[in-house]
């Protein structure tokens, strides 16, 4: 059975054959469901807890 991944930024499930795997210089893997998530994390350094469309925002707010 093929396992699904979870987006490192928004927490959304990524289906097999989709998404983007980013490898940092230290060897750690980051999985992204879209370029929106990739750019928000790596280029713009946004905090996912402050964005309403992420799952971590829903977990941080009561």
Swiss-Prot record:
**PROSITE patterns given in the database record:** RIBOSOMAL_L24E
Q: Which residues bind Zn(2+)?
A: 7, 10, 33, 37
Which free-text remark accompanies the cofactor?
Binds 1 zinc ion per subunit.
User: Superkingdom, according to UniProt?
Assistant: Archaea
Q: What are the GO BP annotations of this UniProt entry? A: translation
Q: Where are the zinc fingers (C4-type)?
A: 7-37
**Which prosthetic group or cofactor does it need?**
Zn(2+)
GO molecular function annotations of the record: rRNA binding; structural constituent of ribosome; zinc ion binding
| CDD domains in the cross-refs | Ribosomal_L24e_L24
Which Gene3D superfamilies would you find in this protein's record?
Ribosomal protein L24e
InterPro entries cross-referenced by the UniProt entry? L24e/L24_sf, Ribosomal_eL24, Ribosomal_eL24-rel_arc, Ribosomal_eL24-rel_N, Ribosomal_eL24_CS, TRASH_dom
* Keywords of this entry: Metal-binding, Ribonucleoprotein, Ribosomal protein, RNA-binding, rRNA-binding, Zinc, Zinc-finger
Gene Ontology cellular component annotations, sorted alphabetically = ribonucleoprotein complex; ribosome
How is the quaternary structure described? Answer: Part of the 50S ribosomal subunit. Forms a cluster with proteins L3 and L14.
Q: Its biological function?
A: Binds to the 23S rRNA.
Family note: Belongs to the eukaryotic ribosomal protein eL24 family.
Instruction: State the HAMAP family in the record.
Output: Ribosomal_eL24
Instruction: Name the chain's protein.
Output: Large ribosomal subunit protein eL24
Supply the source organism for this entry: Sulfolobus acidocaldarius (strain ATCC 33909 / DSM 639 / JCM 8929 / NBRC 15157 / NCIMB 11770)
Q: Which gene encodes it?
A: rpl24e
